[in-house]
């Protein structure tokens, strides 16, 4: 049967499995890419603030 333009296609079990797989890969990518990157950025900010605000050593 021909699919009409305006109606969305009904999701099959195969489509549902593919969507779940994509969501799981996205979650895994968050833990392997986003969190370490965020940690590095926070660490750089902390180091910058520490260096900028430490008292000058006068001898």
UniProtKB/Swiss-Prot annotation:
The chain crosses the membrane at residues 32-52. This is Single-pass membrane and coiled-coil domain-containing protein 4. Belongs to the SMCO4 family. It comes from the Eukaryota. It is found in: Membrane. Residues 9-31 form a coiled coil. It is a single-pass membrane protein. Residues 9-22 have a biased composition (Basic and acidic residues). Residues 1-23 are annotated as: Disordered.
